[in-house]
Amino acid sequence: LLFDFDGTLVETASGGLYAKDLTDMKIKQDVVNRALDLMEQNGVKYFGIISNQCDVGVGFVSDEDIDAKINYVLRCVHDLAVKRGIRGVVYGHYECFSIDEYDPMMKPNPGMVYKALGACRLMMDGITYKDIETMTLMVGSASGLPGQFSDSDKVCAEKAGVDYMDVIQFLGKDLDLNYVLSKEHTSEGIVILNNDHIYILENPYGVDLNI
C-alpha cells in the first residue's frame, strides 16, 4: 500500500486548505482504519508514504521537520496495527523536496514509487518486480477530480504501472460521476463538456497545476 501524505493521510486541523504551521495537522482516521482493514484482510507487507514536499525546496520548512511529521504518522499507523494484531509490516517513506518538475522523484514522475517497489522486492523472496507492481495499490488526493489542484498522484501511479484509487473511492464513497465527467483537469486547464461542446478554461486558478 502506497499513500500520498497531505490531503490523503492527513488534513489540516484548522480546516484551512494549507497548514498554518507544522502543528496544524490531523490524521484522517477513516483512511487509516480502511488501510488497517486491508492490511488485516490481505496480508499487506508494506505501508509506504510518497510525498512531494516542495516547501522544503523553497525554504519554508526544513526536511527534518517534514520527516518528523511523516514519521509521527507512520508510528501512529504502526501502533494501531499492532493493537489489531497486525505484525510483520514494513513502514517506509519517500519525499521529494525539489521544485524542479523534471526531477524523476517529483510526482507525477514515478521515481518515488520505483524506490518503494524496489524496497518491497528486496524484502520478498521469490517475488518478481512485476508481481510487486501487480500487488501494489497507490492512494492519493490529486486525481484530476473537481476541486483538486492536480492529477499528479494518478499520473504517477499510471507511469509506475500500479493500480490507483482516489482517497474518496478508497473509503468506499460514491463519486458523482456525471459531475466528475463534466469537469476534468488537464495540463491546459479545466475541460467543461456542455451541450456537445468542449470548453477549456486555461489554468483558471492562476497556479501551476503540477502535471
Task: Name the predicted role of every residue range.
Residues L1-I211:
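HAD-like aspartate-dependent phosphatase fold
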